[in-house]
Amino acid sequence: MIVVRKALPEEHKEILQVAKQSKYTKDFSNQVMFSSEAAYNKGWIHVAEHEGEIRGFYCIREKVRAPETVLYFIGVAQEAKGLGLGKKLIEHIMATTRHRRLTLNVNKQNEEARAFYDRLGFTVAGESLGGEGLALFKEW
């Protein structure tokens, strides 16, 4: 069974381990976000547990001045790929955020992620990340 819940500050090392397994992550200078207690207290970080172990996570932020939620990171442990955790994480975002628009950037070279977002109905809005990525969105 897959359970998605708010992450706890003391779980940041486990979340970083999953994040480091993810393809095409930048140098992970943003790991500060994962060790910031504020990010946990505000509910920006959630985890997906499978068989009692953290196997996936996401980090979002709901914009104040625009009616959208930004997905900064999503990751699934290599050994948990194919179990539906990524889909469950996206569904959780859609069910729990106040905005009805989710935006994200994906590396153009990451065919696995691009196929994943395509299956979930995301639309390409244009290029991002200095031409290395694509800006995607989904509305519901």
From Swiss-Prot:
What InterPro entries does this protein map onto?
A: Acyl_CoA_acyltransferase, GNAT_dom, MshD_Acetyltransferase
Residues covered by the N-acetyltransferase domain: 2-140
| CDD domains in UniProt | NAT_SF
Instruction: Give the GO biological process terms.
Output: symbiont-mediated evasion of host restriction-modification system; symbiont-mediated suppression of host innate immune response
The UniProt keyword set, sorted, is: Acyltransferase, Host-virus interaction, Inhibition of host innate immune response by virus, Restriction-modification system evasion by virus, Transferase, Viral immunoevasion
Which Pfam families does the entry mention?
Answer: Acetyltransf_1
GO MF term set: protein-N-terminal-alanine acetyltransferase activity
Note whether Transferase occurs among the keywords.
yes
Q: What catalytic activity does the UniProt entry give for this protein? A: 5-aminomethyl-dUMP in DNA + acetyl-CoA = 5-acetylaminomethyl-dUMP in DNA + CoA + H(+)
> Would you identify the family this protein belongs to, as annotated?
Belongs to the acetyltransferase family.
Q: What does this protein do?
A: Acetylates 5-aminomethyl-2'-deoxyuridine (5-NmdU) to produce 5-acetylaminomethyl-2'-deoxyuridine (5-AcNmdU) on DNA as a step in the pathway leading to thymidine hypermodifications in the viral genome. As a final result of the pathway of hypermodification, 5-acetylaminomethyl-2'-deoxyuridine (5-AcNmdU) substitutes for a subset of thymidines in the viral DNA. These modifications probably prevent degradation of viral genome by the host restriction-modification antiviral defense system.
PANTHER family hit by this protein: L-AMINO ACID N-ACETYLTRANSFERASE, N-ALPHA-ACETYLTRANSFERASE RIMI
Q: What is this protein called?
A: 5-NmdU N-acetyltransferase
Q: Which organism is it from?
A: Pseudomonas phage PaMx11
